[in-house]
A protein has these predicted regions:
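C-terminal motif of bacterial Sec signal peptides marking the signal peptidase cleavage site
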Residues: 23-25
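Tryptophan-anchored aromatic micro-motifs
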Residues: 50, 54-92, 119, 123, ...
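Bacterial signal peptide processing site
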Residues: 27-30
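Edge beta-strand at a domain terminus
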Residues: 114-122, 159-179
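Bacterial N-terminal signal peptides that target proteins for export
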Residues: 2-16
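An anionic, turn-rich surface loop/hairpin at beta-sheet edges
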Residues: 126-148
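N-terminal glycine/threonine-rich, aromatic-flanked beta-hairpin/loop signature
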Residues: 86-129, 135, 155-157
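Immediate post-signal-peptide N-terminus of mature secreted/exported proteins
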Residues: 34-56
Length: 179
């Protein structure tokens, strides 16, 4: 009989603990849950972060979850090995933004050239700037968007090069999270 009471007491305690976590608004999984959380996330360009906060403030229930997931994915991209899935010439090659401002890429792979042949990076106003040198005197500014979620999460890097002699369409690279 005492074992049954003990089991019920443990079950009740566990239920109360889960309920208190849920009511406190904490996320067991981490990440952004509201616009204040988004504004605190690192590794997102300030202009893009402000857009996400603005979108969050005017969004409804499920839209808020999508915006929070996008912001969290962008923040977590730094330090994560990305595996190219498009264009075909760089499929399965890896690229990473190191948290200390360096790019991690095999310079013998084509992806090195296709990602501006850079060794450093920084956050721009609305972009991730890939830099030739640490002082970023010469750099290319890439916007990064997120498509899908979970195992289907894709980071879409886009570079628009201005000039009459440049392609009309932007350069696009797609990445999945490495295993």
């Amino acid at each position: 009989m005492s074992s049954l009471v003990s089991h019920r007491a443990r079950a009740a305690t566990a239920s109360l603990l889960l309920a208190s976590v849920a009511l406190s608004g904490c996320s067991i999984l981490g990440g952004a849950r509201n616009s204040a959380d988004i504004s605190k996330l690192p590794n997102i360009p300030e202009g893009q972060k402000q857009q996400l906060v603005s979108q969050m403030q005017s969004a409804s229930g499920s839209e808020k979850q999508e915006i929070a997931a996008k912001a969290t994915a962008l923040s977590k991209m730094v330090g994560t090995e990305l595996v190219a899935v498009d264009p075909p010439s760089i499929i399965d090659q890896t690229f990473k933004l190191d948290p200390k401002g360096k790019t991690v890429v095999n310079k013998d792979d084509k992806i090195y050239l296709m990602m501006s042949a850079t060794d450093y990076w920084r956050l721009g106003q609305d972009t991730y700037d890939l830099c030739v040198e640490q002082d970023c005197e010469y750099y290319s500014s890439w916007t990064v968007d997120v498509e899908g979620s979970g195992a289907d999460l894709t980071y879409v890097w886009t570079l628009k090069v201005d000039g009459d002699d440049q392609p009309k369409e932007p350069l696009v690279r797609r990445f999945k999270v490495g295993k």
